[in-house]
Amino acid sequence: MEQAPEDQGPQREPYNEWALELLEELKQEAVRHFPRPWLHNLGQYIYETYGDTWSGVEALIRTLQQLMFIHFRIGCQHSRIGILRQRRARNGASRS
C-alpha cells in the first residue's frame, strides 16, 4: 500500500508570523499613500467588527491590499504604475 511522502521541503514560517509581517508591511506602505485618520478609522472599524482575532487581521490585510491595488491602478502620483491619462489638444491635433 502506498504511503504519503514525508514532508522533506524547507521549513515554512508559521502562518501567524507571516500574516503579521505582511500586515506590518502593508501598514507601512499605506501610511505613505493615505491620510492617517482614514487608516485609523479603518482599523477601528475592523476592530469593532472582528475584535482582536485572526479574522480581523485577515480582513485588514485583505482590505489594505484592495485599497493599495485600486490606488495604484487609478494612478498614484508617487508611482509610474497605473492608468496614464493623456491630455487632449484643444485644437484636435494629434500627438503622434
Curated annotation (Swiss-Prot):
Phosphorylated on several residues by host. These phosphorylations regulate VPR activity for the nuclear import of the HIV-1 pre-integration complex. The modification Phosphoserine is found at residues 79, 94, 96. The keyword tRNA-binding does not apply. Gene3D superfamilies: 6.10.210.10, VpR/VpX protein, C-terminal domain. Residues 1-42 are annotated as: Homooligomerization. One of its GO terms (cellular component) is host cell nucleus. It is found in: Virion; Host nucleus; Host extracellular space. GO terms for biological process: DNA-templated transcription; monoatomic ion transmembrane transport; protein homooligomerization; regulation of DNA-templated transcription; symbiont entry into host cell; symbiont-mediated activation of host apoptosis; symbiont-mediated arrest of host cell cycle during G2/M transition; viral penetration into host nucleus. Keywords: Activator, AIDS, Apoptosis, Cell cycle, Host G2/M cell cycle arrest by virus, Host nucleus, Host-virus interaction, Ion channel, Ion transport, Modulation of host cell cycle by virus, Phosphoprotein, Transcription, Transcription regulation, Transport, Viral penetration into host nucleus, Virion, Virus entry into host cell. HIV-1 lineages are divided in three main groups, M (for Major), O (for Outlier), and N (for New, or Non-M, Non-O). The vast majority of strains found worldwide belong to the group M. Group O seems to be endemic to and largely confined to Cameroon and neighboring countries in West Central Africa, where these viruses represent a small minority of HIV-1 strains. The group N is represented by a limited number of isolates from Cameroonian persons. The group M is further subdivided in 9 clades or subtypes (A to D, F to H, J and K). Belongs to the HIV-1 VPR protein family. Homooligomer, may form homodimer. Interacts with p6-gag region of the Pr55 Gag precursor protein through a (Leu-X-X)4 motif near the C-terminus of the P6gag protein. Interacts with host UNG. May interact with host RAD23A/HHR23A. Interacts with host VPRBP/DCAF1, leading to hijack the CUL4A-RBX1-DDB1-DCAF1/VPRBP complex, mediating ubiquitination of host proteins such as TERT and ZGPAT and arrest of the cell cycle in G2 phase. During virus replication, may deplete host UNG protein, and incude G2-M cell cycle arrest. Acts by targeting specific host proteins for degradation by the 26S proteasome, through association with the cellular CUL4A-DDB1 E3 ligase complex by direct interaction with host VPRPB/DCAF-1. Cell cycle arrest reportedly occurs within hours of infection and is not blocked by antiviral agents, suggesting that it is initiated by the VPR carried into the virion. Additionally, VPR induces apoptosis in a cell cycle dependent manner suggesting that these two effects are mechanistically linked. During virus entry, plays a role in the transport of the viral pre-integration (PIC) complex to the host nucleus. This function is crucial for viral infection of non-dividing macrophages. May act directly at the nuclear pore complex, by binding nucleoporins phenylalanine-glycine (FG)-repeat regions. This is Protein Vpr. It comes from Human immunodeficiency virus type 1 group M subtype C (isolate ETH2220). The gene is vpr.
